Amino acid sequence: MNTRKIIGIVIMVLLLLLCAVLAVLRFDAAKASDAAALRESLATPAPTAAPDVTPEPSPTPEPTATPEPTATPEPTPDPDSPAGRAAALGLPEPPDIDINSWEFILANGDNSIAEYAPPELVTLEGQLVDSRIADALAAMAADTRAQGLSVYLSSGYRSYAEQEANFLRVCRNNGVSDGKDSNGFYITMPAGHSEHQTGLCCDITDIYYPTKNRSLENTAMFQYMSAHCQEFGFILRFPDGMEPITGVMYEPFHFRYVGVEAAEYITANNICFETFVSLYRDIGTAENPQES
């Protein structure tokens, strides 16, 4: 082999070795680069994940209270009106009536009706009464009898002269001169002051009694009629316990016509006729209603 060929081979071998060395160096460099990157990645801490934050609940708004509607105040009644007078006594508003109508004529110790005479009288079961109350009185008696009870109309209208004679007789029988008992309450009215002169009342019992007194409250007839008389427009005119107002002793037999509306108000509120009339006008020396 000639020298030139040998030199060519040697050069070729050297070139191959050089290429191999370069390849190894490139591999090592790449490997070192990868290792450095790995070391860097391991040295850099992983980012800490932000903790989940539970949002604070929004406060529930308080419900806004709906204001109560303001009640319109009731107008204050005129203190001198029937409603105002009733309110002063703790009573409900009285009915709207004409207190000067015939059925509200007031006869008592302070109110004289000496000149009064009913416009027309009729006879009912032997007693004279104002014709304007006859139907109501007959209906009340019939209703009571329908309960199996006895009804006796014992005294209706009396004229001035008849009441004068009655007053003297009762005073004589009771040993008095003024018609009053020991408490100062009338047991009989002077002529001109008796309700019997109006023809609007009637003494009613279950049978005839020569003398009428408080024991009659125990009769079944009285107990029924006194509980239902207002349905027919009547009231018990002189109730128990109201003597200081009426001025008359308790009479559980004396029924007076005032009309259904007034009778129901008087009975429901447990007042007497004087108190009722005083809601509409001053009583005492005040003039009485019209005669017809």
Q: Whereabouts are the PLM-identified features?
A:
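Extracytoplasmic cell-surface/polysaccharide-interacting catalytic and binding patches
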Residues: 2-292
